Amino acid sequence: MAAVNTVSSLPCSKAGAAVAGGAPRPSTCSVFYPPRCWSKRSSGNGVRAQASTTETTAAPAAEVTTKVEKVSKKQVDGVVTNKYRPKEPYTGRCLLNTRITGDDAPGETWHMVFSTDGEIPYREGQSIGVIPDGIDKNGKPHKLRLYSIASSAIGDFADSKTVSLCVKRLVYTNDKGEIVKGVCSNFLCDLKPGSDVKITGPVGKEMLMPKDPNATIIMLGTGTGIAPFRSFLWKMFFEEHDDYRFNGLAWLFLGVPTSSTLLYREEFERMKEIAPERFRLDFAVSREQTNAAGEKMYIQTRMAEYKDELWELLKKDNTYVYMCGLKGMEKGIDDIMIDLAAKDGIDWLDYKKQLKKSEQWNVEVY
């Protein structure tokens, strides 16, 4: 069973699912997690000694090698992928679609909730595909676009029957001076409650949460890259589960251009009130903030203020880093870590490979 301690401040079209002003209203629902079952498999049943037809001494027995199946540190048990595919998508219904960026924000970002009736058994950190209505310039149906899920596994309404997305409307001017609109993002941002939407998935295991409830989880996000981290944090701080209680440290770094693009800010500040010792929150607002040297405050600039502390955390085997958002953020973060690791005589790029191998460095960028 999972109980929701608080609710989002977002508007909600479902009666009883949320309370205006963010006042908490407990709600319960069943959450099933299959038993954790891992096995070891042998590569063979053994080797018999072979005797030569001309010699009486037996050849030495060959060593028996046993292949041990790797046990993941993440919550992979029972994870479902690709239940719905492009040829046979699930048809959900839009329940809510609301803009969550200010009027002066550089672009629009929308939070939307779709019905699933429990038919899309996703986990925090997974994605779904959306197939927009209509046809392309060649007369063929539009291809699906993948979006990180922005809700916990039980959904914004705590009934395990919805899935939420965080989508930025893509509009830009190409080299010819023509205004181009992203097909799927505009389709989604224009959806009205009651409209149908074709959904595929769920997909992905890269961004699944760690099993260890005492882990340190460092989340690095830019823009709509906040989506999977909202799903993590709702599970950690807004819900109660019989089989999961987060007692570790969650540290979120969120990079955005302006204050009006700080997505879900009220939710995150409420989490800090609930668990001030277990949740740290740092914003990097590039067009409004600078560091001591007068440089623009990008996510890597903010991280540099805590570089020694971050490096010490990264030396521990229960620290997990998750990065989601614009691909350009990777280099800036690597630059910081290269210098830090070098002080200890460590090659950062090699060390990062080890972290990836142990599932402690997880990246989803675009």
Swiss-Prot record:
Disulfide bonds join 184-189. Its EC number is 1.18.1.2. The modification Phosphothreonine is found at residue 216. One of its GO terms (cellular component) is chloroplast stroma. Coiled coil: none annotated. NADP(+) binds at residues 148, 168, 224, 256-257, 286-287, 296, 325-326, 364. Residues 1-48 form a transit peptide. It catalyses: 2 reduced [2Fe-2S]-[ferredoxin] + NADP(+) + H(+) = 2 oxidized [2Fe-2S]-[ferredoxin] + NADPH. It is found in: Plastid, Chloroplast stroma; Plastid, Chloroplast thylakoid membrane. It is a peripheral membrane protein. Pathway: Energy metabolism; photosynthesis. It comes from the Eukaryota. Keywords: Chloroplast, Disulfide bond, Electron transport, FAD, Flavoprotein, Membrane, NADP, Oxidoreductase, Phosphoprotein, Photosynthesis, Plastid, Thylakoid, Transit peptide, Transport. It is an enzyme of class 1 (oxidoreductase). Gene3D superfamilies: Nucleotide-binding domain of ferredoxin-NADP reductase (FNR) module, Translation factors. Residues 87-209 form the FAD-binding FR-type domain. The modification Phosphoserine is found at residue 185. One of its GO terms (molecular function) is ferredoxin-NADP+ reductase activity. May form interchain disulfide bonds with LIR1. FAD binds at residues 145-148, 166-168, 172, 183-185, 224. GO terms for biological process: photosynthesis. Its cofactor is FAD. Heterodimer with LFNR1. Component of high molecular weight thylakoid LFNRs-containing protein complexes containing LIR1, LFNR1, LFNR2, TIC62 and TROL proteins. Interacts directly with LFNR1 and LFNR2; LIR1 increases the affinity of LFNR1 and LFNR2 for TIC62 and subsequent thylakoid relocalization. Plays a key role in regulating the relative amounts of cyclic and non-cyclic electron flow to meet the demands of the plant for ATP and reducing power. This is Ferredoxin--NADP reductase, leaf isozyme 2, chloroplastic. It comes from Oryza sativa subsp. indica.
